[in-house]
Design a protein with these regions (language model features):
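A glycine-rich, hydrophobic loop/mini-helix early in the fold
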Residues: 74-129
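Generic structural signal for well-ordered, non-membrane alpha-helical segments
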Residues: 50-58, 121, 125, 205, ...
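Small beta-barrel nucleic-acid-binding modules, primarily SNase/OB-fold domains
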Residues: 19-25, 29, 113, 124, ...
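Acidic, glycine-rich flexible loop/linker segments
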Residues: 162-239
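Intrinsically disordered, low-complexity regions enriched in acidic/Ser/Thr/Pro/Gln residues
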Residues: 2-91, 224, 228-236, 241
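Extended, positively charged loop/linker patches that create polyanion-binding surfaces
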Residues: 118-181
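Structural motif
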Residues: 68, 85-88, 110-113, 137-141, ...
Length: 244
């Protein structure tokens, strides 16, 4: 693994787009703009999200709602980033067939969000990931366990999970799809927005998508200005006005 230094962090953080000339007030973002290339919002929305991190999206959502949007415990199973509209599923860990039902019913570009309960067992792995990727599913977020890590780490298909283990149940198909999910104090609905990367997973309610995207834009503009000042040698505490 490459050594991370302050210089490389700055270089990594500088993966920002020049948004200074964009009048964000002219845009009315909808989650449907993500897959609608004819929408006037599509290009800018993709630019913002492609260059954003879960940290920035969470900060933005916090400024809008007072909540982080983070689903605790979820972590990436590979280096792939994902964002998109959620298609939900709920199943006992004895049944990985429900994951296939969700995959079969989800639309291209959607992200599967699968909630599992029961004893530790996997409901997602290499075969499901390969099939989902071929169908055009954007990725899988699994509130449960994945498996086949030797394959998942090399697949160009995003998978997020609580952890991984080798055992699995059976293809029963007895769970539910396209239903509301409750995780701790969070209600995740079909059609909500999810964003996941190496930092974790953030869920944004559909009704707050526009406000959160505008706030994400503003976070990115602010951070790009801060990075420019840091490269001039200024202290971060000075830039943000921290009392000393």
């Amino acid at each position: 693994m490459a050594k991370i230094t302050p210089k490389t962090l700055l270089k990594k953080s500088s993966k920002v787009i020049d948004l200074d000339d964009v009048d964000i007030s002219k845009y009315d973002f909808s989650i449907d703009d993500l897959d609608n290339e004819k929408s006037k919002n599509h290009a800018l929305l993709k630019k913002i999200l492609d260059s954003s991190s879960a940290c920035q999206v969470s900060d933005a959502f916090s400024s809008v709602s007072g909540r982080s949007g983070v689903i605790d415990g979820l972590k990436p199973m590979n280096d792939n980033k994902v964002y998109g509209k959620i298609f939900t599923a709920k199943t006992n860990t004895d049944d990985w067939g429900t994951s296939l039902m969700a995959m079969d019913n989800a639309e291209k570009g959607e992200v599967l969000f699968i909630y599992t309960y029961g004893k530790p067992a996997s409901v997602w792995g290499e075969l499901a990931s390969t099939c989902a990727g071929e169908k055009g599913i954007a990725g899988t977020v699994l509130y449960g366990w994945a498996r086949d890590m030797d394959a998942l780490v090399d697949l160009d298909y995003p998978v997020f999970a609580l952890d991984y283990l080798p055992n699995a149940g059976k293809a029963l198909g007895l769970g539910e799809i396209n239903v509301d999910l409750e995780i701790d104090d969070d209600i995740i609905k079909p059609g909500d927005f999810v964003f996941g990367d190496q930092n974790g997973v953030v869920v944004i309610p559909n009704e707050l998508f526009h406000e959160t995207m505008v706030a994400t834009f503003n976070v990115k503009v602010k951070e790009s200005h801060i990075i420019k000042e840091l490269k001039k040698g200024r202290l971060l505490s000075e830039i943000i006005g921290l009392n000393r």
